[in-house]
Amino acid sequence: MADKKAPASGWPIVSGEYVVGNPESCVAVVTLGSHGLDEAAIEAGAAISGPCHTENLGIEKVVANYISNPNIRFMLVTGSEVQGHITGQCFKALYENGIGDDGGIIGAKGAIPFLENAGQDAISRFQNQLVEIVDLIDVEDTGKISSAIKDCISKDPGAFEEDPMILDLEGGGGEAGADESTSIKPAAPETVLLEARMRMISEKINDAALIAKFNSGYYNGKIQGIAIGLFLSLLIFSLL
């Protein structure tokens, strides 16, 4: 049997709308923008399961709960991707690349992928503690999710060798999922999409203006060519 450790007192240390299972399980599940998958994940053996909507504070809260429980060695990212925030891809980028000096998640494609409270030490712990992030983004089939959880459990390497690490988040609260009405105010998905569409419309207007300018020049050049041709024809006939 794999060796286990006690998680931090009161784990999960950050409150939220997640469901908690066996704290000695090696698997934690994030269901991104989907709901209704958590009970199935817990029944399959996950330690914790819940949604995560934002690529900044939401990710920090997930990290805080994971690194405070050394038994968690696998992260299963599933459920529908969050439009605009692209949280699932941001989790993968965080695990693979970490953060820069400015707190930005390297390679993340979300709207505001910056971690203000989780520093290099916490992210390094997150990367080292996890053996693997299992990518089931946009999968909502509870059968596939349960099967993936059980597969991870069969490969349980035991608890991470270091003690629980406590990440202090300003304003408290929790999301793995959680209430996000704290100091960081991420952009709503609708706002991000609206801005993207406005940029696209602006680009199309610019393209249309260029086409109109080209057509206008072409038309004017064509008229000038006809006029010159008529003038030369008259000149030739007058010389005959």
Swiss-Prot record:
Pathway as given in its UniProt record: One-carbon metabolism; methanogenesis from CO(2); methyl-coenzyme M from 5,10-methylene-5,6,7,8-tetrahydromethanopterin: step 2/2
Family as reported in the entry's similarity comment: Belongs to the MtrA family.
Topological domain spans for side Extracellular: 235-240
Localization annotation: Cell membrane
GO cellular component entries: plasma membrane
Cofactor needs: 5-hydroxybenzimidazolylcob(I)amide
Cytoplasmic topological domain: 1-216
Biological processes annotated in GO: methanogenesis, from carbon dioxide; methylation; one-carbon metabolic process
Keyword terms: Cell membrane, Cobalt, Membrane, Methanogenesis, Methyltransferase, One-carbon metabolism, Transferase, Translocase, Transmembrane, Transmembrane helix
Recorded GO MF terms: cobalt ion binding; tetrahydromethanopterin S-methyltransferase activity
Protein name: Tetrahydromethanopterin S-methyltransferase subunit A
Principal location listed in the UniProt entry: membrane
Function, as annotated: Part of a complex that catalyzes the formation of methyl-coenzyme M and tetrahydromethanopterin from coenzyme M and methyl-tetrahydromethanopterin. This is an energy-conserving, sodium-ion translocating step.
Enzyme class: translocase
Cofactor note: Binds 1 5-hydroxybenzimidazolylcobamide group.
EC nos: 7.2.1.4
Residue numbers binding 5-hydroxybenzimidazolylcob(I)amide: H85
Subunit structure: The complex is composed of 8 subunits; MtrA, MtrB, MtrC, MtrD, MtrE, MtrF, MtrG and MtrH.
Catalytic reactions on record: 5-methyl-5,6,7,8-tetrahydromethanopterin + coenzyme M + 2 Na(+)(in) = 5,6,7,8-tetrahydromethanopterin + methyl-coenzyme M + 2 Na(+)(out)
Alphabetized InterPro entries for the sequence: MeTrfase_MtrA/MtxA (IPR030688), MtrA (IPR005778)
Transmembrane segments: 217-234
Pfam families attached to this UniProt entry: MtrA (PF04208)
Protein's UniProt keywords contain Chaperone: no
Bilayer topology annotation: Single-pass membrane protein
